[in-house]
């Protein structure tokens, strides 16, 4: 599933989920070299350093909730779990997002919260690996197809994703208002290009010094 992919894990992520990542072919690296950044706590110092980094401010980095790995482990078809549903925003934004839309996908069932009680256990990892071998052997006998599906009997049968037509209301990824709820504008539209017409766009966290951000961005122009 994660063969050849590099992941960074915040200190808030359990050992079992890290072990699951490695068991599925992934490797653990530092945040600068990682393909994926995982955390279970937006307020953890490790995660805060990511949010405060220039890479994050310039939209070159995204933090995902590690509950994604738990969802994959419990899904009947592991490729059916959409990573985009598990974007973890900074803690300063979460309250407003919840107020407008509701709970995040990893909060929708307390029984499955990985930071509580339902982490992927060593026994589950063993079952997962054994099932993966059986599924691979079965597919080799049936087909040469390059598409790889993984089937296992979940520990608890549960739908780990929601229909796209309800996104993002059910999956709580962005917090953006629906286009259907926006007022219609009948005038002439023009593209907004940061840096033109005397305007610049900034993405700044509360903890970051605004002057330092401006100086770094001005050096680009």
Curated annotation (Swiss-Prot):
Pfam families, per database record: TERB2 (PF15101)
Coiled-coil residue windows: none
InterPro entries documented for this protein: TERB2 (IPR028065)
GO cellular component terms listed in the entry, alphabetical order: chromosome, telomeric region; nuclear inner membrane
Subunit: Component of the MAJIN-TERB1-TERB2 complex, composed of MAJIN, TERB1 and TERB2.
GO BP field: homologous chromosome pairing at meiosis; meiotic attachment of telomere to nuclear envelope; meiotic telomere clustering
Name the record gives this protein: Telomere repeats-binding bouquet formation protein 2
Transmembrane regions listed in the UniProt entry: none
Entry keyword Membrane: yes
Function noted in UniProt: Meiosis-specific telomere-associated protein involved in meiotic telomere attachment to the nucleus inner membrane, a crucial step for homologous pairing and synapsis. Component of the MAJIN-TERB1-TERB2 complex, which promotes telomere cap exchange by mediating attachment of telomeric DNA to the inner nuclear membrane and replacement of the protective cap of telomeric chromosomes: in early meiosis, the MAJIN-TERB1-TERB2 complex associates with telomeric DNA and the shelterin/telosome complex.
Subcellular location: Chromosome, Telomere; Nucleus inner membrane
Keyword terms of this UniProt record: Chromosome, Membrane, Nucleus, Telomere
Gene: TERB2
């Amino acid at each position: 599933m994660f063969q050849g992919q590099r992941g960074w894990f915040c200190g808030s992520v359990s050992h079992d989920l890290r072990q699951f990542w490695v068991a599925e072919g992934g490797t653990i690296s530092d945040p600068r070299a990682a393909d994926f950044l995982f955390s279970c706590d937006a307020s953890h110092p490790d995660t805060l350093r990511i949010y405060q980094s220039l890479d994050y401010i310039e939209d070159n980095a995204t933090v995902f909730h590690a509950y994604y790995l738990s969802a994959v482990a419990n899904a009947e078809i592991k490729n059916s779990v959409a990573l985009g549903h598990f974007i973890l925003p900074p803690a300063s934004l979460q309250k407003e997002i919840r107020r407008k839309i509701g709970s995040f996908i990893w909060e929708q069932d307390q029984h499955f919260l990985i930071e509580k009680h339902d982490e992927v256990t060593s026994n589950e990892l063993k079952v997962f690996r054994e099932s993966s071998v059986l599924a691979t052997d079965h597919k080799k006998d049936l087909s040469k197809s390059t598409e790889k599906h993984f089937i296992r009997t979940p520990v608890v049968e549960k739908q780990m994703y929601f229909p796209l037509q309800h996104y993002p209301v059910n999956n709580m990824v962005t917090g953006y208002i629906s286009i259907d709820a926006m007022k219609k504008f009948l005038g002439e539209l023009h593209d907004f290009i940061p840096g033109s017409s005397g305007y610049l766009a900034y993405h700044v966290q509360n903890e970051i010094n605004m002057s330092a951000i401006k100086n770094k961005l001005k050096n680009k122009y």
